[in-house]
């Protein structure tokens, strides 16, 4: 941490609140304790995936409600695409409900674009939080489509060593200098494993 944190290298902190990982990890635990409504929750959770494979990071009240990033700061966490697939696979293994992959879900939309590197200047909050077609209708895709977009976009976002970029590294709040050149061998292997499972 001494070389990865620009401020107080011996200090860890948390921001609180319920985020993307919490959402999917809650589903994982509910699969073991109260599996009845987990399929419906999983379907709604996929509405937090953007069309570029990134995800909403703030969870609103109730299932399927997502909020743009705090303070208007574009954030992309490189591990976010792992959780939906891990959870959905366990759900299918536990229930046999393979048809969940064919169910439709919308895509989240806010001003963040191009995997958090640009702002969509044409987006207006009045448009709502869903990706729309050129005709103004909410675009939906299968859950399988959501999974493929997430996995492929994350897998191909690599750094100078052809390893997945670390991006924000927010699961370790002591690293705030990883966004430029940080890479993760562990998550590269995890995404490769997810792609093998999808194949």
Predicted regions span which residues?
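Aromatic-rich carbohydrate-recognition surfaces in CAZymes
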Residues: 30-34, 38, 42-160, 185-192
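Conserved, charged catalytic cores of large soluble enzymes
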Residues: 167-171, 190-199
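Aromatic-acidic/polar surface patches that form glycan- and anion
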Residues: 16-19, 77, 180, 184-187
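Acidic/polar, glycine-enriched structural segments that form the non-catalytic walls/loops
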Residues: 1-15, 118-126, 130, 199
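Acidic/His metal-coordination segments adjacent to aromatic residues that form catalytic metal sites
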Residues: 2-9, 57-75, 166-183
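C-terminal ends of transmembrane alpha-helices
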Residues: 156-170
